[in-house]
Amino acid sequence: MVREKVKVSTRTLQWKCVESRRDSKRLYYGRFILSPLMKGQADTIGIAMRRALLGEMEGTCITRVKSENIPHDYSNIVGIQESVHEILMNLNEIVLRSNLYGTRNALICVQGPGYITARDIILPPSVEIVDNTQHIATLTEPIDLCIGLKIERNRGYSLKISNNLEDRSYPIDAVFMPVQNANHSIHSYGNGNEKQEILFLEIWTNGSLTPKEALHEASRNLINLFIPFLHVEEETFYLENNQHQVTLPFFPFHNRFFNLRKKKKELAFQYIFIDQLELPPRIYNCLKKSNIHTLLDLLNNSQEDLIKIEHFHVEDVKKILDILEKK
């Protein structure tokens, strides 16, 4: 563990790591300070950083398992101590480190009896395991077990949607969140109008990256969000008597749904749930948080309603329609 005394600069804004430790292979802790800040700035930065650390960071997870040995995900396999559900839960706990984009395949192919750990996973070159000792299963008899794994990099979380059971493929709830927790606190000093603040930021990670790396990545993500404002043309717009008010062009949302209804009259949209569509995790989570559970719910929302959904974009509607038209 590394711990340093806090020295406050009275002039230049500076940040510093004042405590760093590794509690285990899958738990890192870091404590940072930023000072000096004017009154109110510490809370503004602290809230933004915490949200960026917990919601904007990308992680790598096992998202799907495929094996001819598994009849269904709540079954038991002769010669294996754990149930299939327990094996899937153990695979869900595996912590991976990578910078991959898209998806990759991995493989477990072992012969019993013996213990299967994360060390037995055959990974692509771009992926590595944080803790090789993580337990997966126990083979009690001399059987062969081969399991195919799908690895993805994303952010947030992805709820499993069981729709490919015919090919013995089983999804896993994936949590793409390398930062397990983040807190901020504020210390004020000085008197009167000269009062200043120190921001303390605590970060816990799962070992796939260090707290310092997480802080840098979250900072870059926040900077990228604000960059477009730096390029806004310096023009002043005056809206007098609504003369220059611009109406958003009608997005052909309902038109495309109407065409879908004509082609697929047998579909009852109120019975088609968004869980069935294999939507990207961000789109799925946005809709769920807005109580949109079926296609009918989606259709009953106006363009203005959809745009008001946090983190939801017009392009996301197009993605949903593209998926529907392929069904």
Swiss-Prot record:
Keyword set, alphabetical order: Chloroplast, DNA-directed RNA polymerase, Nucleotidyltransferase, Plastid, Transcription, Transferase
Region spans: Alpha N-terminal domain (alpha-NTD): 1-233
InterPro entries, per database record: DNA-dir_RNA_pol_insert, DNA-dir_RNA_pol_RpoA/D/Rpb3, DNA-dir_RpoA, RBP11-like, RNAP_asu_C, RNApol_insert_sf
Catalytic activity, EC: 2.7.7.6
GO BP terms: DNA-templated transcription
Broad EC category: transferase
GO MF term (any one): protein dimerization activity
Alpha C-terminal domain (alpha-CTD): region residues: 267-327
SMART domains for this protein: RPOLD
Disulfide bonds, paired cysteine numbers: none
Coiled-coil portions: none
Main location: plastid
Localization in the cell: Plastid, Chloroplast
GO CC terms of this entry: chloroplast; DNA-directed RNA polymerase complex; mitochondrion
Reaction(s) this enzyme catalyzes, per UniProt: RNA(n) + a ribonucleoside 5'-triphosphate = RNA(n+1) + diphosphate
Keyword Transcription: yes
Function: DNA-dependent RNA polymerase catalyzes the transcription of DNA into RNA using the four ribonucleoside triphosphates as substrates.
Family per similarity comment: Belongs to the RNA polymerase alpha chain family.
Quaternary structure (record): In plastids the minimal PEP RNA polymerase catalytic core is composed of four subunits: alpha, beta, beta', and beta''. When a (nuclear-encoded) sigma factor is associated with the core the holoenzyme is formed, which can initiate transcription.
This protein's domain notes: The N-terminal domain is essential for RNAP assembly and basal transcription, whereas the C-terminal domain is involved in interaction with transcriptional regulators and with upstream promoter elements.
Name of the protein in question: DNA-directed RNA polymerase subunit alpha
Gene this chain is encoded by: rpoA
